């Protein structure tokens, strides 16, 4: 059995249960002749058990026959960090100028465990450092050991 020829890839961040034909989904899929309604139905069906509105990075593979497959990744680290710090927005200033909230090292470790499949490391300590770096760049102070 031969594999289908790949026409291209589309990377989008789509809210869980919120795929609609409106931009950015409609235009991105329409350019590649993908059935937008079918994609929206399949995506919404596969995310129906998740909290509505959670941003999900999605990699859509489009094939030459206009069929598609998609892989849903874990939500961005910034989503989890904002949730744990109980803030709605990160700092717009550089990391040392404005601290907008705090997260604990245990929070970062917990987020790292959730994000492990999408991070480029298999070591939990390295993954925790990646998450701590994301927290610092968002203006969050990491407290604890």
Swiss-Prot record:
Gene3D superfamilies per UniProt: Ribosomal protein L11, C-terminal domain, Ribosomal protein L11/L12, N-terminal domain
Pfam families hit by this protein: Ribosomal_L11, Ribosomal_L11_N
Record PTM text: One or more lysine residues are methylated.
Keywords of this entry: Methylation, Ribonucleoprotein, Ribosomal protein, RNA-binding, rRNA-binding
Subunit details: Part of the ribosomal stalk of the 50S ribosomal subunit. Interacts with L10 and the large rRNA to form the base of the stalk. L10 forms an elongated spine to which L12 dimers bind in a sequential fashion forming a multimeric L10(L12)X complex.
HAMAP family given in the database record: Ribosomal_uL11 (MF_00736)
Function: Forms part of the ribosomal stalk which helps the ribosome interact with GTP-bound translation factors.
Family: Belongs to the universal ribosomal protein uL11 family.
The protein's name in its UniProt record: Large ribosomal subunit protein uL11
Gene: rplK
